A protein has these predicted regions:
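Carbohydrate-recognition loop of C-type lectin domains
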Residues: 1-115
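An aromatic-glycine-centered, glycine-rich loop/turn in mixed alpha/beta architecture
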Residues: 95-164
């Protein structure tokens, strides 16, 4: 699997993420699932799929019996809506900025093929020093992402919900 990751990532600089999935009933049939760094939603273009497929086809790259098929990871869209409740002496704008920086960092790190979005991670990212309470309105629960998908955040709306 690591060799396929290496050759897929080396094929083109636009390859962002890669998962290698082997079918239980036919372990020689491999799905090479990639995402694209410069596409709007992370899905790979047909051109990139062909470039990576060509890079994996030569027999010196793969075992003779392996049959790798390059596929695009499918974007699983979600949005984040949250309210932050601050202390009486807190500087709202600074706390909001810090929470937004941390949630954007989490979104970038989580944009991996097969990476689920966990509410606990969202709470952790949003709960910066000075925030008393975080209420996440969306997503309502964990977002389960399978090996053929990657999470794609379409919008974030983080606001100050009040003073406590």
């Amino acid at each position: 699997a690591n060799a396929y990751r290496y050759f897929a990532l080396s094929a083109d600089g636009r390859v962002d993420g890669i998962k290698v999935y082997s079918h239980i009933d036919n372990p020689y049939l491999l799905d090479i699932i990639i995402s694209q760094i410069d596409s709007q939603n992370g899905e790979a273009t047909q051109e990139l799929l062909q470039i990576v497929q060509t890079a994996l086809d030569p027999e010196h790259v793969r075992p003779v019996c392996d049959r790798p098929i390059v596929k695009s990871s499918i974007a699983s869209p979600y949005s984040i809506n949250a309210r932050l409740f601050v202390g009486k002496n807190a500087e709202d704008s600074l706390l909001l900025e810090a929470a937004n920086i941390r949630i954007q960092s989490y979104i970038q790190k989580a944009r991996k093929n097969g990476q689920s979005i966990r509410l606990s991670a969202l709470y952790a990212a949003l709960h910066v020093d000075g925030i008393n309470r975080v209420v996440i309105d969306a997503p309502a629960s964990d977002i389960e992402i399978d090996v053929y998908q990657h999470p794609h955040c379409t919008a974030t709306n983080i606001t100050i919900g009040g003073v406590e």
